[in-house]
Amino acid sequence: SRAKDDLLAYFESAAKKADTRKNEELVEPLINNFFDNYAYMAPETEYELVKQLFNMIPDQAINQTVAQIIPDNNMVVIYKAPEKEGLEQPTAADFQQAIDVIKVSEIKPNEAESIESNFLDPATLKGSAIKSESEGIYGSTVWTLKNGLTVVLRPSKEEKDKVVFDLYKDGGKSLIPTGDLSSFESNVWGAFQGFCGISKFPGTTVTKMLSGKNVGVEPYLNALRHGVRGSSTPKDLETALQLAYLYFADPRFDQAEFDKAINQLRAVLPNFVLQPSYKFTKELQKTLYGDNPRNIVISEETLDKANLGTIEKNYRMLFNDAAGATINICGDFDIETIKPLVEKYLGSIKKGKKPLNWVDNNKNMLPGKVTNDFKVDMQTPKVTVIEVFDAKLKEYRLLDDVALSAATYILDMRYTKSLREDEGGTYGASTHGEISILPKPEATLQVYFDTKPVAADKLVELSIEGLNSLAKDGPTAEEFDMTVKNLEKNIPESRISNEYWLGALRFANTYGIDYDKEYENCVKNLKPADIQNILNEILASGIVKTVIMRPDTAAEAE
């Protein structure tokens, strides 16, 4: 029944937002129609057909079909395990014996499970009314609730049958003591979220309760900000806001569930840490930040330090109340319809007295030029290279942000020509540029590529030459024209995304800048010299970190 509910919810949502589909959503169905003669239907037609089929198919027919597609013959057993000294590997006879035992075993069918349909009783919540209302940026409506929460609403039809929200506060990981950060390493935090659940419901039960609903809600922690974000259909928005409320009012800390999560991580960690990708990440972090204790990478030591009590202590400190909090809600909703839901659920978050503020813990990239060139065992010999350039800026300017985006676009084109087409040394290099505003304005540029061992040193040299050339001589007229046209093309494409407007609202609230308007102005007024200026400012800082991971001699020889 839950599987049917999930499928019906998927096809129902697809039908409602058929008019706002993006091009990429049309590609696969058309390919299937052309090559496999699979029927191409409008989403509304497909939804009606699925409903009819589900009414005609009894559960017994599904069970019979499963039995038919899992016969005793034509069975293949695939076994994968690390090649590790002292690990006893099962034989083919062991697998056959296990299969024979299962065949004659009496396996009881799953028992029907009673799953609650409601996360809470709305009647128990007092809520709080709207204290004030005003017009906001981008056609939004701004409410201030009596509990202090600022609510920014931007209804639109750009993406039908979809609502997204972000409830955020200042603080984030910056407020967590250094000694507690192992409990908030990304894998540990993700495991806690997935297993522990919410209120009186463990994670597995929450998943079952959300069957047939298009709802995704989760608490999050960034470096300087934390909160609860989510998405849903308009029909399921009440459930989404209930969960947002519960992540503040009634979080769940279940030791048994947490232990399960940590044990799962322990089971995969020994093999995971042997992977070249893990070793590369570990060396990269060490090269960028040295032994900064606030920089945590998963390890046995990290898991040993992870503690549910530590998570609970810090979580309750961060997600305690609505003081200083703002929620942006964008998408397909009606303001009058959403009003009682906002007052009931978001208005029931505790008021609080003093807003939290982030702290600058000085997690800065190490100064100077450093090259970390190391070797690891790997089955498929290749060299992985990342070059990181960093600079502190005197001030943040959106024009610099646009110029850096333009620079990465041009570098991608140049590296495709020089590293891939001319040298044949890589499938492609990727560049990424970013300017952060807080805690201090800072620009970072990364160049990343994989290559064959014999070509690595030359490609590193060419990548540096390409960057220096762009900084010194600027882009060609053709490169600049292509780049500006691409940036201009992306503007209207971005504006049909609810997530874009969430970010624009948060940017305006945090920095007082009309991102949408100013970004377009910067693109229109961009000059080649702007690209040179930001690159030269980054290069002038002298902060350059190069990490090169090569295969060891034995692997390379093979």
Where are these regions (language model features)?
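Short amphipathic alpha-helical segments
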Residues: 236, 334-338, 399-403, 407-411, ...
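Edge/loop elements at the starts and ends of beta-strands within beta-rich repeat scaffolds
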Residues: 69-71, 223, 318-320
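Bilobed periplasmic-binding protein/Venus flytrap-like ligand-binding cleft at the lobe interface
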Residues: 248, 346, 403-414, 462-470
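Peptidyl-prolyl cis-trans isomerase
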Residues: 57-61, 65, 252-259, 303-306
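Proteolytic maturation boundary segments
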Residues: 2-5, 32-178, 326-328, 333-377, ...
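Flexible helix-coil linker/hinge segments at domain or subdomain boundaries
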Residues: 254, 351-357, 473-480
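M16 family metallopeptidases and their MPP-like homologs
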Residues: 1-55, 75-81, 152, 159-250, ...
